[in-house]
Amino acid sequence: MTIAHYHLPGLFEFYELYRRFLPLYRNHPEYFYDWCDIGSIYGAPADCLWGGGRVGSGESSARDVLALMRDYGISPRLTFSNSLLRAEHLRDARCNALCQMLNDGGNGGVILHSDLLLRYLQKTYPNLYFVSSTTKVLTSFPDLQAELERAEFRYVVPDFRLNHALEKLNAMPQGQKDKVEFLCNECCYFGCRDRRACYEAVSRKNLGEGGDEHRCHAPDAAAGYRFSKAMENPGFIGVADIQRTYLPMGFENFKIEGRELGSALVLEFLLYYLTKPECQLKVREEIYLDNMLDLF
C-alpha cells in the first residue's frame, strides 16, 4: 500500500502538543488512518538568525525536542529558509550548534532557501538532508522541474498554486514525483503577488535588519488564518484529494503549515489529516477535553 508522509509544523513551537499526541498516535493506531504516517516535524527556535518563512517562536530545549523525535522515529527538520544570508552569518553559533545536533542524530534535515547556506551545510554537516523551501515561490512549472533536477535536494516544496496542475504533475517521471512535497493547507490569497516580498520581510526581521514591515493587502487579510478559509482556497489539498488523486498518481509527501498558529488549530490539522472522523472526539478527550473544561 502506498503511504502518504505528512511533514508537520512546530518542531520547537508545539513540543508540548506533540509530547501528548505522539504517545496516543503510537498506542492507539486504531484512531488513525493506516494509509499515512508522520514523515517529519519541522520548525525553529525563537530568534534563529538563519530562520525564514515565519519568525520562529519555539522555546523548548533542543535536546528535549530531538529526544522526542528520536523516541518516535520521526525526522526533525530545521526551518532555516532565510533568503538574505551573507557569509558572515554562517558563523552563527546557535544555528551551527543545532545543525551539529541534527547531524549527530543521523536522520535530520534542513529546509532552506539560500544556496550559500546550502553549500556551507553540505560541507560542514554531511549527514543532513536538504529540502528546497516554498519561500522560493516556484510558481512556474519549468522552474519547479529545474529545482527537482538538483541532486542536493531530497524534497522540493513548490508554491501552493501549482498543487492542482494535475496534467503536468502526472506527466513527471517517478523520480521527480518522489521529491515533490505539496503544501496542503495554505491560506494565502491565491492571486497574491507579494508572497516573495512577505518572505523577504521575515528574513530581514530574523537578521535584525531594518525595513518596512510587510503589509498584506489580500482580501480578508485582517481575519488571519482560518482553516475553513484555507479549505476554500483553490490550492487546498484535502484528505480525499490525497487518497483519490495524489497517491494514485505517485505522490507521497504532503506538508502542513502552521508554525505561527496556535496549538489548538494545529491539533485540528492533526485531527483532519491523520485521524479517523469517528475517533476525533476521542483524541480531543485524550489531549485536552474533559468534563470540567469551560470555554467561557
Residue ranges with predicted function:
Residues 1-143, 147, 153-296:
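Active-site pocket-lining/capping segments in soluble small-molecule metabolic enzymes
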